[in-house]
């Protein structure tokens, strides 16, 4: 599992690369991981997506 600082860092990196569309991409990665039976990975992707949403809300 990633610590909170790493989750925020990765979320920020995805937002820089993909813009606000990163949230949808991150959620899609969570769905893919879950479909492949990897609940831990899916949880991590969802945490990163949630951090990306929080970052976007701070920018408003």
Predicted features along the sequence, with ranges:
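Long, non-catalytic architectural segments outside compact domain cores
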Residues: 1-32, 36, 40-43, 47, ...
């Amino acid at each position: 599992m990633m610590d909170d600082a790493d989750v925020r860092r990765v979320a920020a990196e995805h937002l820089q690369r993909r813009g606000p569309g990163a949230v949808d991409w991150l959620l899609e990665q969570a769905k893919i991981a879950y479909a492949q039976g990897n609940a831990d990975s899916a949880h991590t992707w969802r945490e990163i997506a949630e951090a990306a949403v929080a970052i976007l809300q701070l920018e408003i």
